[in-house]
């Protein structure tokens, strides 16, 4: 009877009022990496790496791109007859050129400093074409016969629209001396060229003079070109070649031309009426009737994320390109769902063995159990502080990294391959550094966030422990067991920090002494039972061994000899 009373007393002790400190858990499968661990499941996370694009060319902040279709930049600026739709173009946000446009220099040749011109256009948003030397002003030269079958239009020979190929007139080619003064307030882009005939006969046929030159001068330019007559293979049916040049004429500056043959004269020039961020982007896409803040050659990105892995070349206000496949910031806690089959207290409660899916209105909080029932209650103050802190941190990271960032392709000619290779290696190096920095940033911040949550739970636990002191027992799993009755009002006082320790200290002391006495008595009883059980077991074993030996001796299976 005494042992039954002891057992009931122990059961009664186990079922005392309890309060546990724990944290939120949910069904999330989001995983993050930290400095110390990989694939940590968390309750909440935020992806900061954009991986999607729309596969279209879009307007940039409401301004359409200039999509050159099958025309090159050279074909557009010189006026290839197949590019007539681009003779006058509105303002553009960026220029799109195919990798290998078919309508470029229809008459074979070269565009001097072409890559530098493309670089210049990365800071231009609008040209206004103006006439600087009218075609009909060449009274002593033939300004209409300079056409070629290499530049056809409607089945007939034609030529670049914006320059004039001057031919001899009446078997004479008088020396040209022309000057144009830039009275505009804007810079002017001026283009001209020189023709290199196939042989001396062609030279005389076209220009009459055999020793010719083209001289061009401004306040900053002094250039003299001489035709190079040579036999060449035919390109587009032509053995001759043309070489084109360009310069920027500043306001109040003048450009002078002098030539006695082979001159490709400018008729139109381009007034640079608007400068700004632009680019020449290589892409085969068509316009998608859309708007974006960030464009890549493979499609537009509409994202507020600080990083992307869509394409290394961009134009606009873009995230930074990194080579990473995953950049996820932890914003919630470690997600360790409770083990429902093991009961609530002592197995799943607290921050040691698992979180609570039943607590949905906060990150940290309490679970209590008393005679009035049980329930969850979030600690909203600590939760809100944590949410504010993490939100501010994430926003700060995004604001710092999500600045306008453009990475446009650089142009190199055939003689600059070593420079191009070096540039690619440098850019790859920068991308590697950016990628490493981004990944390290995420790993460190995730480690700090999870440590921050662990610290907040521990602080909440310490807050309760300091209030209860010896009025309750720590169960070692995030729970406290009261030595006194604690109704719902008492539980609320623990949660809000107003628990009255003296009010319950006497009751706790008496119950604690009673429990300690019961434990001592039960310990003595169990010790006696343990000794009795050990002696009885040993005696029974000895009797069994003796009986077995006697039986084996009697049937001859075991020989027994007693020597004196």
Swiss-Prot record:
Gene3D superfamilies, per the entry = 3.90.20.10, 3.90.209.20
Primary location group: virion
- Key word Glycoprotein present in the record? yes
| Cystines in this chain | 20-479, 58-290, 71-83, 106-151, 294-318, 486-490
Chain ranges on the Extracellular side, renumbered to this chain: 17-527
Instruction: Quote the record's miscellaneous comment.
Output: Major glycoprotein, comprises over 80% of the envelope proteins present in virus particle.
The protein's name in its UniProt record: Hemagglutinin
Tell me the name of the encoding gene.
HA
């Amino acid at each position: 009877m005494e042992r039954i009373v002891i057992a009931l007393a122990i059961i009664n002790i186990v079922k005392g009022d309890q309060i546990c400190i724990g944290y939120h858990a949910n069904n999330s499968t989001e995983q993050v990496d930290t400095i110390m661990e990989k694939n940590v499941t968390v309750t909440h996370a935020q992806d900061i790496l954009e991986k999607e694009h729309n596969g279209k060319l879009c307007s940039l902040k409401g301004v359409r791109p200039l999509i050159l279709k099958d025309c090159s930049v050279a074909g557009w600026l010189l006026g290839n007859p197949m590019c007539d739709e681009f003779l006058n173009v509105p303002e553009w946000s960026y220029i799109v050129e195919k990798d290998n446009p078919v309508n470029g220099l229809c008459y074979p040749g070269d565009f001097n400093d072409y890559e530098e011109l493309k670089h210049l256009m990365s800071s231009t948003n609008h040209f206004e074409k103006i006439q600087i030397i009218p075609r009909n002003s060449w009274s002593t030269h033939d300004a209409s016969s300079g056409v070629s079958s290499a530049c056809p239009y409607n089945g007939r020979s034609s030529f670049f629209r914006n320059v004039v190929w001057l031919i001899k007139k009446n078997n004479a080619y008088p020396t040209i001396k022309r000057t144009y003064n830039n009275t505009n307030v804007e810079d002017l882009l001026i283009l001209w060229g020189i023709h290199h005939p196939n042989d001396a006969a062609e030279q005389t046929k076209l220009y009459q003079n055999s020793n010719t030159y083209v001289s061009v001068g401004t306040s900053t330019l002094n250039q003299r070109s001489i035709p190079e007559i040579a036999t060449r293979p035919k390109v587009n049916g032509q053995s001759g070649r043309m070489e084109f040049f360009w310069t920027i004429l500043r306001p109040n500056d003048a450009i002078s031309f002098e030539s006695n043959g082979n001159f490709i004269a400018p008729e139109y020039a381009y007034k640079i009426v608007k400068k700004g961020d632009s680019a020449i982007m290589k892409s085969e896409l068509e316009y998608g009737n859309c708007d974006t803040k960030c464009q890549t050659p493979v499609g537009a990105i509409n994202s507020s994320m600080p990083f992307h892995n869509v394409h290394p070349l961009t134009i606009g206000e873009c995230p930074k390109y990194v080579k990473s496949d995953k950049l996820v910031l932890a914003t919630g806690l470690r997600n360790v769902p409770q083990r429902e089959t093991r009961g609530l207290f002592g197995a799943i409660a607290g921050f040691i063995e698992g979180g609570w899916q039943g607590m949905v209105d906060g990150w940290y909080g309490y679970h209590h159990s008393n005679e009035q029932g049980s329930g969850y209650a979030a600690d909203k103050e600590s939760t809100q502080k944590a949410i504010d802190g993490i939100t501010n941190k994430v926003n700060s990271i995004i604001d710092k990294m999500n600045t306008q960032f453009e990475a446009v392709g650089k142009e190199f000619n055939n003689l600059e391959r070593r420079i191009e290779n070096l540039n690619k290696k440098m850019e790859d190096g920068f991308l590697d550094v950016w990628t490493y920095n981004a990944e390290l940033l995420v790993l460190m911040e995730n480690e700090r966030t999870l440590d921050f949550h662990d610290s907040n739970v521990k602080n909440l636990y310490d807050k309760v422990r300091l209030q209860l002191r010896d009025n309750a027992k720590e169960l070692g799993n995030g729970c406290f067991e009261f030595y006194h009755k604690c109704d719902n009002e008492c539980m609320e006082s623990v949660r809000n920090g107003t628990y009255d320790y003296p009010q319950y200290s006497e009751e706790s002391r008496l119950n604690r002494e009673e429990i300690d006495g019961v434990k001592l008595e039960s310990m003595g009883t169990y010790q006696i039972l343990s000794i009795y059980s050990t002696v009885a077991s040993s005696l029974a074993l000895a009797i069994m061994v003796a009986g077995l030996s006697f039986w084996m001796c009697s049937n001859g299976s075991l020989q027994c000899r007693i020597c004196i």
